[in-house]
Amino acid sequence: MREPDRRSVELNELGWWSKWAKLRWRDDGYVLYSDKFREPFFNRGGSLTCRAAAPAAAWVERALSQRKMTPTFLAFEDCRAAEKLTASSYVREDTMAVLSSRGPVGGGAGAQAVSPSASSDEWASAYLRSFYGDEALVGPVASIVSSLFHSRGVTLLESRARGEVAGVLAIFRTRGVAGVYCVGTVPEHRRRGVASGLLTRAKKLADAEGRSLVLQTLESDGALGLYLARGFGVMYTKAVLQKRLK
């Protein structure tokens, strides 16, 4: 299957996170921001093209500074914008790798789709425990999950063990693309094939629909090796840049 172009993958990602945070555009530049989730991941900007990166970075900086947030900008590694920003007042905080599935995932525990009647609290709890280690934000996350049950193009998957949700994964579909998000395993269920099982189910769904399965992962999360071992390959990378605070 032919891999989707970069713009299609980026629009899929932004379409997904616009369900969690507010999304604003200026030409090919964008900014995400949230009052509920104050971490940089939900308060960041970027550009769909290299040409628009410089003006987009200036606009994103103003927009996030007005919200009392540290300006965070994601720049394609093959754009000179990353070099220019780091040469001025930005520092690299992380790297985001964008991957596509290029073969069978293989192995893993079984996963099932979540029905609209299922508990949004339970899915949200597993997501938060997987990524944050606590459930402090279960209220706002459960509210989003509840709306996702009925959102077009979204499928929520879960893997259960010992009577509870052991891992979660979300699929968001756009033209030709099935984006995978929120791949998480609850700590006490790790190293038991939970994530592999979820990815296997997602791969089967994407293949059946004729879509490319793609995902993003941050270098700091330490999951890149897992995905590479499960048949994914790197399409491109983005520098996660933050403005130095004076």
Where are these regions (language model features)?
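N-terminal charged segments
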Residues: M1-R67, D78, A82, H150
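Conserved acetyl-CoA-binding loop-helix of GNAT-fold acetyltransferases
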Residues: A53-E61, C182-T185, R191-K204, A229
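Conserved active-site alpha-helix within GNAT-family acetyltransferase domains
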Residues: C79-R92, S196, E219-T237
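A conserved beta-strand-loop-helix scaffold within acyl/acetyltransferase catalytic domains
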Residues: L137-V186
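Conserved acyl-CoA
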Residues: A58-K68, R173, G197-S212, G233
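Conserved catalytic-core motifs of GNAT/GCN5-like acyltransferases
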Residues: R92-R102, G233-K246
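Conserved beta-strand-loop-alpha-helix junction that forms the acyl-donor binding cleft
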Residues: F73-R80, V214-L224, L241-L245
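A short beta-loop-alpha structural element at the N-terminal edge
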Residues: M1-R6, R51, A111-S125
